[in-house]
């Protein structure tokens, strides 16, 4: 893989995690009027490209050097993902549950979305730790990604035997929101990434022109606005996501050329995974504190935009300190990601 493409994937991954934090900072239940509509537009449309991007990049990297899928390749990839995905999932899931449970024990009114924790039975505890994490709900992505790696031979076989038809079938399931165990969005975009890695590596290296990127950006905004009144929401929303991803992918090329690569390898990109796993429940706590100061819809909107900046800043400070003074701990909780 070229240095250009490697840096591009890291930069887009960092942008995606920033969008995830903005997505999770929404305060729609407290909002109305212009504040509500702006948050709805950003939360339900613009920031939604972040999760598919993560899955796409993960699928691309998983299959990038795969010439043929055999038992040795599968065991090697699964072993690496146990360290990089499963171990961090368990650590952060247990930590998130412990934090929320402890805070609710001291302040029962905190974390209103997690009622009845004190009544949990063994099955509830296991589900909260292994399937639907409490406090760190964003870990569902890590869970689904590990499951996608586990079924990678099926995805590989589908692409090799059915080729583009396999992608079409997954697209249809996604457009019509047909779900089963693993999110269909997870499976689809991991598979798209795998398809590109197996068949179109050179296309991923292609530098997009400013004209095509501008057109994609305009169309993306049109589709985002169109979503609100369209009776075929899933289809239009899905097409908007694809346009948005294509736009951001090409936008990197434009920014790289315009800035002479100034932002191609920023040091903050190395903390993407830590921000992802650490931003909750920190973000919920920050929003709860700031909401007590909000006196108007303008105040709520300011919280919506300022909370992500504050939380990302906290995450970066904590990541740097942890990596500096406890490098082994940092590597373990981040799945070996130290660079």
Q: Where are the model-predicted features located?
A:
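Membrane-cytosol interface segments of multi-pass membrane proteins
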Residues: 1-170, 296-339
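Membrane-interface junctions at the ends of membrane-embedded or membrane-associated helices
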Residues: 2-3, 65-76, 157-162, 198-211, ...
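Aromatic-anchored segments of alpha-helical transmembrane domains
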Residues: 18-25, 167-181, 216-229, 281
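Interfacial loop-to-helix transition and helix-capping segments at the boundaries
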Residues: 39-51, 130-144, 174-192, 207, ...
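Hydrophobic transmembrane alpha-helices
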Residues: 60-64, 148, 152-156, 186-202, ...
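Small-residue-rich segments of transmembrane alpha-helices in multi-pass membrane proteins
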Residues: 88, 92, 216-220, 273-278, ...
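Solvent-exposed interhelical
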Residues: 147-171, 178, 195-214
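Alpha-helical transmembrane segments and terminal signal-anchor/GPI-anchor hydrophobic tails
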Residues: 202-274, 281-290, 297-304
């Amino acid at each position: 893989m070229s240095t250009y493409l490697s840096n591009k994937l890291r930069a887009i991954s960092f942008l995606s995690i920033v969008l995830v934090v903005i997505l999770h900072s929404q305060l729609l239940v407290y909002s109305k009027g212009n504040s509500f509509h702006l948050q709805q537009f950003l939360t339900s449309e613009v920031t939604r490209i972040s999760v598919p991007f993560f899955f796409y990049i993960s699928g691309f990297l998983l299959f990038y050097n795969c010439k043929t899928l055999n038992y040795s390749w599968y065991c090697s990839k699964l072993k690496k993902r146990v360290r990089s995905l499963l171990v961090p999932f368990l650590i952060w899931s247990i930590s998130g549950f412990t934090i929320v449970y402890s805070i609710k024990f001291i302040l029962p009114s905190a974390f209103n979305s997690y009622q009845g924790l004190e009544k949990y039975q063994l099955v509830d505890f296991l589900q909260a730790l292994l399937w639907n994490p409490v406090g760190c709900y964003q870990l569902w992505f890590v869970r689904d990604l590990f499951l996608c790696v586990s079924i990678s031979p099926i995805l590989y076989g589908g692409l090799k035997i059915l080729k583009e038809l396999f992608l079409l079938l997954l697209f249809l399931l996604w457009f019509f929101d047909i779900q089963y165990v693993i999110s269909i969005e997870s499976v689809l975009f991991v598979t798209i990434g795998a398809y590109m890695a197996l068949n179109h590596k050179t296309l991923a290296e292609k530098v997009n022109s400013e004209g095509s990127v501008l057109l994609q950006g305009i169309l993306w905004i049109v589709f985002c606005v169109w979503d609100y009144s369209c009776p075929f929401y899933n289809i239009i929303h899905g097409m908007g996501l694809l346009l948005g991803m294509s736009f951001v992918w090409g936008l990197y090329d434009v920014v790289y050329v315009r800035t002479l690569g100034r932002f191609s390898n920023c040091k903050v990109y190395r903390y993407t995974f830590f921000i992802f796993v650490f931003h909750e429940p920190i973000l919920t706590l920050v929003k709860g504190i700031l909401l007590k100061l909000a006196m108007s819809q303008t105040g709520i909107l300011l919280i919506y935009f300022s909370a992500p900046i504050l939380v990302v800043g906290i995450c970066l400070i904590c990541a740097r300190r942890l990596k500096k003074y406890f490098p082994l701990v940092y590597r373990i909780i981040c799945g070996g990601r130290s660079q």
